Swiss-Prot record:
Ni(2+) 1 binds at C2, C5, C7. Involved in the maturation of [NiFe] hydrogenases. Required for nickel insertion into the metal center of the hydrogenase. Exhibits a low intrinsic GTPase activity, which is essential for nickel insertion. Keywords: GTP-binding, Hydrolase, Metal-binding, Nickel, Nucleotide-binding, Zinc. Residues 61-71 have a biased composition (Basic residues). Ni(2+) 2 binds at C208, H209, C240. This is Hydrogenase maturation factor HypB. Residues 36-112 are annotated as: Disordered. One of its GO terms (molecular function) is GTP binding. Belongs to the SIMIBI class G3E GTPase family. HypB/HupM subfamily.
Amino acid sequence: MCTVCGCGGHSVEDQFKAHLKSQGKDGAHKPAPFAVLAEPQGPHSHSHSHWHTHADGTSHAHPHAHSHSHAAGHGAEADSDHPHAHGHDHGHSHGACAHDIHLGHGPAGTEVPGMSQARLIEIETDILSKNNQYAARNRAALAKNCTFATNLVSSPGSGKTTLLVKTIEMLGAQPLAVIEGDQQTTNDADRIRATGAPAIQVNTGKGCHLDGAMVEQALAHLPLPAGALLFIENVGNLVCPAAFDLGEDAKVAILSVTEGEDKPLKYPDMFAAAGLAILNKVDLAPYCDVDLDLYEANIRRVNPQIEVLRVSARTGDGMGAWIDWLRAGLARKAR
């Protein structure tokens, strides 16, 4: 997560209020303004672990924390104004910069000017503890309803929404609902609603991820029959969402074959937190000069226990295994 992520107040679109407002007295449809429930939030912080991979291939994790305010956006980038020590030798070349900058070696996993590592860890503990309270309430409510919830996380453009649309089509009469997270617009929620499935859009504004409180608010306005599947499509971001429990049963990390085989090593936190990785757009592999086996190997370097599925949401290849995984998860919740 960035040192100053600029998370702002979020809004949850209530599709039913929006629908009612879209109709005039004569019953004719008119363009509907967004009906939103706004919840401005005060100062807070985020945290999670960061992985660091050395040139010799060894990897290890660091905790990470930072604080910021929800009251306003931030326009400045974080920078470091102090020297940084390294415990290993560097070669020197006069033709190029010989020293990389690593800000994650301290106990807190990051550096913020004017703030000690101890204070960063204190903030980390506080914000995650509060989020976990919301997540626990969500988890209890979903368990009571025998709902299997997945938190879909990825970079922007990995194909999450296309995968969801295909999934909904293949599930047929299976009860389900979707929470869509984006900074702005209802584009993805509109695509989901076009399939006939209920969906709520959560616009996070300056926020770079969903959190437990946002999901709790969305659930209050989403019809969710007993025994349903719940899909939470998080904001496109491979860093920040890794730290935040939403009350889901599993995080599902989605990776497009166009993103590069080393993506799991460069952004390991999410793959370490996920129970399933979906390697999407495999139909493009022959045109991208990529090694699918290397993708899987790098994912498992970060998380040896993770399950990996190769899927093309466009052609349907591999989708059967994904549907089976969802139904197995739902069956476990019903026991």
